Amino acid sequence: VFDARTGELLSPNGRPRLVVGRADNDSLGADLAREVTGRSEGSRLLIARPLSSAPASDVPATPTTRLNTGEVVVIDILPTLASGQASAQVNGSGPLEVTMRDEGPVITHGDQLPSGPTVQPLLTGSGGQVRADDDIVVQYFVSGWSDGIERESTWRTGVPERVRLSELMPGLRPLLIDQKVGSRLAITLPPDQATGDDTLSIIIDILATAPAS
């Protein structure tokens, strides 16, 4: 956000505000929600909006010098799915076979249980790398190896989540560090590095990073 008159950066700490959620009044306010609704993912919008008609603080308040104060808001509409390049061997390079459908990933695998954590890059992004102290914006799907039952998924709603890397399962954190934004990964975690009851199969899209909130 910039001051429309001076060009001064107004965003707190000079950082963009990362908003994760629906394009509605609660998340963005009525005016910005109206502007972004219907726009395509990947778009950048430049929006000028008035704040008041008060005179600038350094200009005498006369009828001829009265200025409209306002701000210029730059909005990047981030993708809600990984946008990287397909890896040379999407399937066959690890224990998981993954098919993507509109409702989310479908995972199959053989009988051989992985002896440790595994990572298969399904899509390789070209964005910034994930750092150890980041928050990350992700779509994810988690199922049990033994029964294949879905345990958690953001694909149910299509709305990504912002999570703190330091609060993820201990086995998952090191597998995400240095991965690039835009990547889609197929991961397996053994019980002692996950929730303790079963090996987990995880599909995760890395959509954005931000300094930890």
Predicted regions: what is each one?
Residues 1-213:
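Cross-family detector of peptidyl-prolyl cis-trans isomerase
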